[in-house]
Amino acid sequence: MAFPGPRVLVVGSGIAGLGAAQKLCSHRAAPHLRVLEATASAGGRIRSERCFGGVVELGAHWIHGPSQDNPVFQLAAEFGLLGEKELSEENQLVDTGGHVALPSMIWSSSGTSVSLELMTEMARLFYGLIERTREFLNESETPMASVGEFLKKEISQQVASWTEDDEDTRKRKLAILNTFFNIECCVSGTHSMDLVALAPFGEYTVLPGLDCILAGGYQGLTDRILASLPKDTVAFDKPVKTIHWNGSFQEAAFPGETFPVLVECEDGARLPAHHVIVTVPLGFLKEHQDTFFEPPLPAKKAEAIKKLGFGTNNKIFLEFEEPFWEPDCQFIQVVWEDTSPLQDTALSLQDTWFKKLIGFLVQPSFESSHVLCGFIAGLESEFMETLSDEEVLLSLTQVLRRVTGNPQLPAAKSVRRSQWHSAPYTRGSYSYVAVGSTGDDLDLMAQPLPEDGTGTQLQVLFAGEATHRTFYSTTHGALLSGWREADRLVSLWDSQVEQSRPRL
């Protein structure tokens, strides 16, 4: 019985795994392909849910840099998932610098509004400093290790020049700057900018285009890719326990055929393969790498997994009977006036977790509901996951009553939130280059096994956002990484065909 082409297993059906599978299925080598998904649905950290009479994104929210060089944008356009505005050339040419737009409304913890003029001044200062971090790209030595340290040093010098401001104005400026630190924590998926390495920070590449959403849900994209695969390609509720590599494994159905890799699943299934593409999140690898690979990973790759950062950014959706914000409001920013990026306060998470919340995005396109989406990163975000829905709703009701100055503000009638740190096969949101690591570690993440080229080639390959040096933390980085590993296998198969041809 002849074997029908190379056997390939893809671990994980996020956009990296699905992208790799789609590309491989169309190759003339006709690989025998299966995707092993630990959960009951595809999409990974792309997770859309019908809720409140509309669609909420519990995972990926925007296409970042929706323009011609963004493969996620191109696929979404090809599948008809974008509107005229998103597809317009004007939208694609906008250069945001990767920075969050200024809010429509700014509320403070004293129940008063903050002037847009002051917010704009502080935004200009903060994002100017963020741009200056690029000066340290590729520097062998930097004056400090982290982005946070650099920002705080520069801000301290700026504070000294605020001689015409009274004490209250200086405090308010620092409180506003603190909200920008919290926003940047959400963007970077970290607890603190003190954890983010300064030298490689500028290596992350921002594509042009005004960030856009998929009105019908981001998961429409992964659903389309899934639908393009042959039936039953994806096995759901099939968590992998251990990947045995650099071996010689057999299967009764194919006597005489040996495979260098054996994937052992939690349900006891043992699946031999020629190649395995691992697309699981870095957070999962951090927790399980010691038992997930046998033999263990090479020391350099194992060290890269430990050194790179992987944090949590969660969303909290609140549904209201009636809106208490203006009709044209898009983003409400919250400023806690007793905070400052220059002060380290070790307060109880129980009492202060909500102060890490950056504010609320007004959700469009809901039939009859009025929905706000709050963003929160770091340890405070992880603590929030441990609370009940009722506790979260109560805390945020108190926050909103305080910042609006309206103690009678009606509570939200329901809440829905993400809990990415608690998700056993994810353990967080996305990666960042942490202090002690560099872009080289992202490249190490992408390096296939075995590394020395001995034995069977390309046994275990790696994809996912944490394997892309310049687009880490993004869906387009994840998709490109899946395509990269598929292309790596295709190149191998093509070279094998070429070598097997008789020479005249």
From Swiss-Prot:
Motif window: Microbody targeting signal: 502-504
Q: Name the consequence of N313 to A/D/L/T.
A: Decreased enzyme activity with N(1)-acetylspermine
**Where in or outside the cell is it found?**
Peroxisome; Cytoplasm
Q: Which residues form the signal peptide?
A: none
**Which cofactors does the annotated protein need, by name?**
FAD
* Residue sites binding substrate per the record: H64, V187, N313
Q: Which reaction does it catalyse?
A: N(1)-acetylspermine + O2 + H2O = 3-acetamidopropanal + spermidine + H2O2; N(1)-acetylspermidine + O2 + H2O = 3-acetamidopropanal + putrescine + H2O2; N(1),N(12)-diacetylspermine + O2 + H2O = 3-acetamidopropanal + N(1)-acetylspermidine + H2O2
Q: Which family does it belong to?
A: Belongs to the flavin monoamine oxidase family.
Protein name, per record: Peroxisomal N(1)-acetyl-spermine/spermidine oxidase
